[in-house]
Protein backbone atom coordinates (compact mmCIF):
# COMPACT_ATOMS: atom_id res chain seq x y z
CA UNK A 1 0.00 0.00 0.00
CA UNK A 2 0.97 3.61 -0.49
CA UNK A 3 0.47 5.65 2.66
CA UNK A 4 -0.19 9.35 2.10
CA UNK A 5 0.35 11.94 4.79
CA UNK A 6 -2.69 14.23 5.22
CA UNK A 7 -3.93 15.42 1.84
CA UNK A 8 -6.84 17.65 2.84
CA UNK A 9 -6.94 21.44 2.76
CA UNK A 10 -4.75 22.80 5.49
CA UNK A 11 -2.94 25.86 6.73
CA UNK A 12 0.32 23.93 7.20
CA UNK A 13 2.64 22.37 4.65
CA UNK A 14 2.38 18.96 6.42
CA UNK A 15 -1.45 19.26 6.42
CA UNK A 16 -2.08 18.16 10.01
CA UNK A 17 -3.96 21.48 10.43
CA UNK A 18 -7.04 20.45 8.43
CA UNK A 19 -9.68 23.05 7.72
CA UNK A 20 -11.58 21.22 4.96
CA UNK A 21 -11.92 17.44 5.09
CA UNK A 22 -13.84 17.21 1.82
CA UNK A 23 -11.23 18.58 -0.59
CA UNK A 24 -7.67 17.64 -1.45
CA UNK A 25 -5.37 20.61 -0.95
CA UNK A 26 -4.81 22.45 -4.27
CA UNK A 27 -1.05 22.29 -3.76
CA UNK A 28 -1.43 18.50 -4.10
CA UNK A 29 -3.59 18.69 -7.21
CA UNK A 30 -7.14 18.80 -5.83
CA UNK A 31 -9.71 15.99 -5.92
CA UNK A 32 -9.50 15.08 -9.64
CA UNK A 33 -5.76 14.41 -9.41
CA UNK A 34 -6.28 12.30 -6.30
CA UNK A 35 -8.93 10.25 -8.11
CA UNK A 36 -6.50 9.77 -10.99
CA UNK A 37 -3.87 8.55 -8.50
CA UNK A 38 -6.40 6.13 -6.99
CA UNK A 39 -7.32 4.74 -10.40
CA UNK A 40 -3.70 4.36 -11.48
CA UNK A 41 -2.71 2.70 -8.20
CA UNK A 42 -5.65 0.32 -8.29
CA UNK A 43 -4.97 -0.58 -11.93
CA UNK A 44 -1.51 -1.72 -10.77
CA UNK A 45 -2.84 -3.71 -7.83
CA UNK A 46 -1.74 -1.13 -5.25
CA UNK A 47 -3.75 0.35 -2.40
CA UNK A 48 -3.90 3.91 -1.05
CA UNK A 49 -4.11 4.56 2.71
CA UNK A 50 -4.97 8.08 3.85
CA UNK A 51 -3.83 9.82 7.02
CA UNK A 52 -6.85 10.73 9.13
CA UNK A 53 -6.49 13.60 11.59
CA UNK A 54 -9.67 13.27 13.64
CA UNK A 55 -8.50 14.35 17.10
CA UNK A 56 -8.13 17.99 16.14
CA UNK A 57 -8.73 20.41 13.29
CA UNK A 58 -7.27 23.72 12.26
CA UNK A 59 -8.18 27.07 13.69
CA UNK A 60 -9.44 27.71 10.12
CA UNK A 61 -12.02 24.90 10.33
CA UNK A 62 -15.47 26.37 9.57
CA UNK A 63 -17.18 25.20 12.75
CA UNK A 64 -14.38 26.55 14.94
CA UNK A 65 -14.46 29.89 13.11
CA UNK A 66 -18.21 30.03 13.60
CA UNK A 67 -17.62 29.86 17.36
CA UNK A 68 -14.97 32.58 17.11
CA UNK A 69 -17.43 34.80 15.24
CA UNK A 70 -20.62 34.01 17.16
CA UNK A 71 -19.50 32.94 20.60
CA UNK A 72 -22.02 31.17 22.78
CA UNK A 73 -24.72 31.60 20.09
CA UNK A 74 -22.90 29.29 17.67
CA UNK A 75 -24.64 25.95 17.07
CA UNK A 76 -21.13 24.47 16.90
CA UNK A 77 -20.18 25.49 20.44
CA UNK A 78 -20.19 21.87 21.64
CA UNK A 79 -17.97 20.71 18.76
CA UNK A 80 -14.98 21.79 20.86
CA UNK A 81 -14.17 22.20 24.56
CA UNK A 82 -14.45 25.96 25.07
CA UNK A 83 -13.81 27.35 28.56
CA UNK A 84 -14.74 31.00 28.19
CA UNK A 85 -15.33 34.02 26.00
CA UNK A 86 -13.94 35.85 24.25
CA UNK A 87 -11.84 33.01 22.90
CA UNK A 88 -8.07 33.45 22.88
CA UNK A 89 -7.40 31.84 19.52
CA UNK A 90 -4.57 34.16 18.47
CA UNK A 91 -3.21 35.93 21.56
CA UNK A 92 -2.66 34.77 25.10
CA UNK A 93 -3.24 31.33 26.52
CA UNK A 94 -5.99 29.50 24.61
CA UNK A 95 -9.19 29.00 26.59
CA UNK A 96 -10.21 25.88 24.68
CA UNK A 97 -8.71 22.40 24.42
CA UNK A 98 -6.03 22.19 21.79
CA UNK A 99 -3.59 19.48 20.85
CA UNK A 100 -0.27 19.91 22.68
CA UNK A 101 -1.52 23.35 23.77
CA UNK A 102 -1.09 24.63 20.23
CA UNK A 103 -3.81 27.25 19.65
CA UNK A 104 -3.84 26.47 15.92
CA UNK A 105 -5.05 22.91 16.64
CA UNK A 106 -8.38 22.93 18.51
CA UNK A 107 -9.35 19.47 19.72
CA UNK A 108 -12.70 18.07 18.70
CA UNK A 109 -15.24 17.17 21.35
CA UNK A 110 -15.56 13.59 20.12
CA UNK A 111 -18.16 12.89 22.82
CA UNK A 112 -20.55 15.06 20.80
CA UNK A 113 -22.71 12.86 18.50
CA UNK A 114 -22.70 15.58 15.80
CA UNK A 115 -18.90 15.61 15.76
CA UNK A 116 -18.79 11.83 15.55
CA UNK A 117 -21.32 11.85 12.72
CA UNK A 118 -19.28 14.43 10.83
CA UNK A 119 -15.97 12.57 11.25
CA UNK A 120 -17.50 9.20 10.40
CA UNK A 121 -19.07 10.73 7.28
CA UNK A 122 -15.65 12.05 6.25
CA UNK A 123 -14.13 8.60 6.75
CA UNK A 124 -16.89 6.87 4.80
CA UNK A 125 -16.81 9.46 2.01
CA UNK A 126 -13.16 8.88 1.17
CA UNK A 127 -13.54 5.09 1.36
CA UNK A 128 -16.53 5.41 -1.01
CA UNK A 129 -14.33 7.49 -3.32
CA UNK A 130 -11.85 4.61 -3.50
CA UNK A 131 -9.34 5.06 -0.67
CA UNK A 132 -8.39 1.68 0.76
CA UNK A 133 -7.93 2.59 4.38
CA UNK A 134 -6.90 5.02 7.07
CA UNK A 135 -3.78 5.60 9.12
CA UNK A 136 -5.21 7.37 12.15
CA UNK A 137 -3.23 10.17 13.74
CA UNK A 138 -2.87 10.21 17.56
CA UNK A 139 -5.89 7.96 18.26
CA UNK A 140 -4.82 7.62 21.91
CA UNK A 141 -5.69 11.32 22.37
CA UNK A 142 -9.37 10.40 21.96
CA UNK A 143 -9.98 8.84 25.36
CA UNK A 144 -13.34 7.19 24.68
CA UNK A 145 -12.53 3.97 22.84
CA UNK A 146 -16.14 3.69 21.68
CA UNK A 147 -15.25 6.42 19.17
CA UNK A 148 -12.80 4.07 17.44
CA UNK A 149 -15.18 1.12 17.63
CA UNK A 150 -17.87 3.20 15.95
CA UNK A 151 -15.34 4.58 13.46
CA UNK A 152 -14.37 1.04 12.53
CA UNK A 153 -18.00 -0.06 12.19
CA UNK A 154 -18.81 2.89 9.92
CA UNK A 155 -15.72 2.35 7.79
CA UNK A 156 -16.08 -1.43 7.50
CA UNK A 157 -19.76 -1.06 6.62
CA UNK A 158 -18.62 1.04 3.68
CA UNK A 159 -15.83 -1.36 2.70
CA UNK A 160 -15.22 -4.50 4.78
CA UNK A 161 -11.67 -4.68 3.38
CA UNK A 162 -10.73 -1.12 4.35
CA UNK A 163 -7.50 -1.16 6.35
CA UNK A 164 -7.36 0.72 9.66
CA UNK A 165 -4.11 1.37 11.47
CA UNK A 166 -3.48 3.79 14.30
CA UNK A 167 -0.39 5.68 15.37
CA UNK A 168 0.19 4.00 18.75
CA UNK A 169 3.61 4.83 20.26
CA UNK A 170 3.26 2.28 23.07
CA UNK A 171 1.95 -1.24 23.60
CA UNK A 172 -0.87 -1.63 21.08
CA UNK A 173 -2.44 -4.94 22.16
CA UNK A 174 -5.70 -3.36 23.34
CA UNK A 175 -6.13 -1.58 20.01
CA UNK A 176 -5.71 -4.78 17.99
CA UNK A 177 -8.54 -6.96 19.28
CA UNK A 178 -10.50 -6.68 16.03
CA UNK A 179 -12.87 -3.98 17.23
CA UNK A 180 -10.75 -0.87 16.57
CA UNK A 181 -7.74 -1.36 14.27
CA UNK A 182 -6.45 -4.09 11.95
Can you annotate each of these PLM segments?
Residues 38, 42-44, 56, 61-72, ...:
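Active-site-proximal helices and loops of the catalytic beta/alpha 8
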Residues 92-99:
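Catalytic pocket of metal/acid-base enzymes, prominently hydrolases
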Residues 1-36, 46, 145, 151:
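Aromatic-lined carbohydrate-binding/catalytic grooves of carbohydrate-active enzymes
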Residues 3, 49, 135-137:
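Conserved beta-strand positions in the central sheet of alpha/beta enzyme cores
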Residues 17-31, 101-116, 132-142:
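The substrate-binding groove and active-site-proximal loops of carbohydrate-active enzymes
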Amino acid sequence: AIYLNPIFMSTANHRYHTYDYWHVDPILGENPIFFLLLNEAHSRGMHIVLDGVFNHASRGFFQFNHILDNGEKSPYLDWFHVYGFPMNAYQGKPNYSCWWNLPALPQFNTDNPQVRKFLFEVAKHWIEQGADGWRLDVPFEIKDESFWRQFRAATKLTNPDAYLVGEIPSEAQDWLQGDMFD
